[in-house]
Amino acid sequence: MNKIYYLKYCHITKSLIAVSELARRVTCKSHRRLSRRVILTSVAALSLSSAWPALSATVSAEIPYQIFRDFAENKGQFTPGTTNISIYDKQGNLVGKLDKAPMADFSSATITTGSLPPGDHTLYSPQYVVTAKHVSGSDTMSFGYAKNTYTAVGTNNNSGLDIKTRRLSKLVTEVAPAEVSDIGAVSGAYQAGGRFTEFYRLGGGMQYVKDKNGNRTQVYTNGGFLVGGTVSALNSYNNGQMITAQTGDIFNPANGPLANYLNMGDSGSPLFAYDSLQKKWVLIGVLSSGTNYGNNWVVTTQDFLGQQPQNDFDKTIAYTSGEGVLQWKYDAANGTGTLTQGNTTWDMHGKKGNDLNAGKNLLFTGNNGEVVLQNSVNQGAGYLQFAGDYRVSALNGQTWMGGGIITDKGTHVLWQVNGVAGDNLHKTGEGTLTVNGTGVNAGGLKVGDGTVILNQQADADGKVQAFSSVGIASGRPTVVLSDSQQVNPDNISWGYRGGRLELNGNNLTFTRLQAADYGAIITNNSEKKSTVTLDLQTLKASDINVPVNTVSIFGGRGAPGDLYYDSSTKQYFILKASSYSPFFSDLNNSSVWQNVGKDRNKAIDTVKQQKIEASSQPYMYHGQLNGNMDVNIPQLSGKDVLALDGSVNLPEGSITKKSGTLIFQGHPVIHAGTTTSSSQSDWETRQFTLEKLKLDAATFHLSRNGKMQGDINATNGSTVILGSSRVFTDRSDGTGNAVFSVEGSATATTVGDQSDYSGNVTLENKSSLQIMERFTGGIEAYDSTVSVTSQNAVFDRVGSFVNSSLTLGKGAKLTAQSGIFSTGAVDVKENASLTLTGMPSAQKQGYYSPVISTTEGINLEDNASFSVKNMGYLSSDIHAGTTAATINLGDSDADAGKTDSPLFSSLMKGYNAVLRGSITGAQSTVNMINALWYSDGKSEAGALKAKGSRIELGDGKHFATLQVKELSADNTTFLMHTNNSRADQLNVTDKLSGSNNSVLVDFLNKPASEMSVTLITAPKGSDEKTFTAGTQQIGFSNVTPVISTEKTDDATKWVLTGYQTTADAGASKAAKDFMASGYKSFLTEVNNLNKRMGDLRDTQGDAGVWARIMNGTGSADGDYSDNYTHVQIGVDRKHELDGVDLFTGALLTYTDSNASSHAFSGKNKSVGGGLYASALFNSGAYFDLIGKYLHHDNQHTANFASLGTKDYSSHSWYAGAEVGYRYHLTKESWVEPQIELVYGSVSGKAFSWEDRGMALSMKDKDYNPLIGRTGVDVGRAFSGDDWKITARAGLGYQFDLLANGETVLQDASGEKRFEGEKDSRMLMTVGMNAEIKDNMRLGLELEKSAFGKYNVDNAINANFRYVF
């Protein structure tokens, strides 16, 4: 762009025009054509507000103009890295897709360039920019946000091409430099079908749109802004140094869906290409010129772009280890210095006078280098770059100023030099910088890459400050705090794209948060938990610095609230917009400026007051809170409201809010040039994950696009609103200026934009919860209220309501999967829906575990719907009043409602859903499919439709009535109770239909031989085959009622006249198996009875102590199985007699066993003791005797005849004798035939109970088992100097000599007696005993049996003996 040198008055337009120095002669005749290189701006005639006379892009009028703006600023849908972006026209038609490359990052282009258009310079190195050579007029430029201003201090012009590079005064920390293509000026390198698959550009200046008819309309930029778009493949000329594209035809698909034609006003703006080989975007050119058909760019080559940075370096400083430190001396007057190590000296150059560009860069190589400043250094624009590890210190408090520090990847620099007040140390590079100076560092820090560790040390007075302020930007850097005193937290700010503040286990308190965008991150990765306190406060006048700017004749940009001085009128103005027009044209526009008079002090006070008022508005934090920390938010000054529209990731941390309001919300998508609004439709979803949110007399809102995972604990009148419409937006969002919060209301229009909560909410002491949008979790409410208006609420955890209300508002939908427990009633309002189910299986699709719910009532209003299905069990009355409510019990979906839970039979009785309670609703509709309804009291329904279900009237204590206007029943069972004179009643008043329904009757006392009790009454003419008598098992019998049909003038009745019973073999067998469980326990003890004596024959010794542990499993028919653990401890003594060794001893025993079968399950604990003796004759014969007593504590749960769980005690005793003979085949091997007899006693047991009103009893008497065993063992001994091992195997036959007692069963059909059965089995054992040294014995044995009704499946026992 041309530099403006003077303004000339035009008599035709009667206004000033800006004239370039390149115009040889400029007149203002309307017919005179201006030179291509002359750019004129007529402010009055064209009503332009831009500060430069520039023409820029012409784009399609068919596509929303905002898309081109968003594209250029990486806003809206054009976030860097986004793929497959669809472009639509104004009518919503798809124009095309950006699918050849991920979205480029344009942040390296300037966002402002002083009085020049934005985008005409591009950062390609941390301190260097490139533009067109003919572009001039401003030395200041900004990156990321407008306030991040840098000054160009040096230029390198290309002698033959329209391109130049410029050096900045500091390293840029806000953005990453663009990468430059390594192809460079090669003819044909950028043509179609080559390595580069996509071309994007951006720029600023005057803008136009053109429709398909060729009509062009100007877009007024009001200070200038960026637009961008797609460019076709490029052709080369001038030996590849120039590239061109036919961009003039913006409707040619070859130019891409966002084609744009550029004019001279956009000179210097960048052109990017996607390198498909290296998978990255690279800078390939800057705009130079244009024709009527297209545009021309100068190719950016690495050779030329590298010239200026190379020329700005002094000689490389190569540190040599072992030759001492580098002594750095500097002469500020001459701007020169030296670095000396031993006999080697390197010259350096710093700021000379006011010339920052005189300062040269220094590159330090070598490793473990040391530099000591002998003098304070002002290096001007020169920066320090470290390619190795270094330590830089000051001899005696010397300071350093310059362009900044670059630490290369993998390097670590220990920086022990303080800075200067008013200057910031700029740090880039992927390496680490540890700040380790002493005392108070008055300088600031701006970090854009790598890691900075703040570890400043206290001075003699205990004062410490690593920096006066810390700015974190670009999204790349991390700042680590070694302690909490390094920097005032209020002076930490996060700029463009932010970065990480690593707390490192330290605690911080913020009274203000300066976070420009979502890139701001406060994190703690230390194992030591940090606490962050957000004690946000209103600004104080003393904290506010008000710089006074000068109104520029060329217009400019600023931040709303900035103070300006107009020298021509000597008045002060406060800027209300983000930019202002040139030539003072809008100085009287009250929407742009606020006139605050001529008094400087009063003007400053006005600005301060406005900033104070703004800071008292609700607070907002756009950034992130991550890691191992807790966050505390006390009562805040001002309006005590904090809105978080960033994110929270504290999986093991909590956030605590005391009073006031806390809001978690999504974030409105930022669009270029527009202010975010609560009413806009596009929002970004934000995630808030934490262990717990604690509210104390506070209000919490989870608003649109907020997704929260974590528990909430609300107490002392707190309010929780999940799905709130209350949101806050930031008027400064996307500008980098101070947050200016604006309250609004926003309701999601799609389910995906609704708030989404997952967790458990606990309410206490008059707190309240409103569920208005997506909810998944549980609730515990104590003396509180809960309302649900959401149509997508799921309780997948328990819902518990103690002295608390649960209300489903109009149209709400709630599904409870883990049960609802309420001491009060649940209200379901008009058109609302409440569904109770079991817990879905995480492993099996369509499977559920049964879940019980209980309330004091379910109240249904008009058109409300209530369902229990998929293993849901509800104990509650349902009240529908006179409303047309719908009640659904069960589910017809064959693929859902399955279960493999043992509760399916015991609790659910094999049905999909269970209701225990009455239904009252004369106009209600009840639908039952595969459901069970225990209807007690008086129930009433308008219509009842039942399929494959069961309805049990009454509870066996009080008679119940079910009255239905219309009953349709198929394959359904109805169960009623009678006392022989009265019975439960089913009354159908209007219509009866259906078939294959059975009626069962439970008798509350012994049935009479003759009776006549009405069970069912239906309208006259009803089909008498609708109901038939059914048979059910009660006790140990099958009972069938005798039902006759009576027809009267107005009704058809089903009348009970008697009953028939037959014995049920299955129930009797289940009872017999249950009673026989004691025998199996006896048998387990028998198998363990004589183990000790067998050990004595293998390992003889003297007096000693021993211990044994045995674990085994057994099984029998009837699906019986058991497992047991048996422990014995004992002591015995050897008595040496003539021809015989007699062992006598005592033992204590404990057995823990569990058993189950199709009839019952249970557990037994047995404890006892005994005495034994074993005689081992020298001839090889032996004789063993043992007696033992056991006490048993038993708990069994039966699943037959409603026996339930029984706890009882029993006892048994055992007397055993065994005789055998050990024949030695050799000295080491032997054969041992055996015979054993065990006699015992097992105590009897008796049970009495009722099943469906029928009295039952079950008992067996004490009985005396007699068990014999014969067998043979073989064995062999192996020995060494101090050890001996005896291995053996055995085969035996065990048999009952007496039957195992008698079982007596009694029910209404009479007495049934069952004699015990005998059993026998083959026993197989293998084992070994080991003698270790002289006093230790170890043994191990495996046992199994076969061919018995009861068998030992596997048993293993181990024993240990210590000989005295």
From Swiss-Prot:
Q: For the Peptidase S6 domain, which residue ranges apply? A: 57-307
| Any Gene Ontology CC annotation | extracellular region
Site (described: Cleavage): 1089-1090
Q: Which residues form the signal peptide?
A: 1-56
Gene Ontology biological process terms in this record: proteolysis
Identify which residues the record assigns to the active site. 134 (charge relay system), 162 (charge relay system), 267 (charge relay system)
Q: What happens when the gene is disrupted?
A: Mutants exhibit an attenuated virulence in the rabbit ligated ileal loop model.
Entry keyword Transmembrane: yes
Nucleus: is it a keyword of this entry?
A: no
Q: What else is known?
A: Secretion across inner membrane is dependent on the SecA and SecYEG apparatus. However, intracellular polar localization precedes secretion and is independent of SecA.
PANTHER family cross-referenced by the UniProt entry: AUTOTRANSPORTER, HEME_HEMOPEXIN-BINDING PROTEIN
Q: What is known of its domains?
A: The signal peptide, cleaved at the inner membrane, guides the autotransporter protein to the periplasmic space. Then, insertion of the C-terminal translocator domain in the outer membrane forms a hydrophilic pore for the translocation of the passenger domain to the bacterial cell surface, with subsequent cleavage.
| Protein name, UniProt field | Serine protease SepA autotransporter
Organism source for this protein? Shigella flexneri
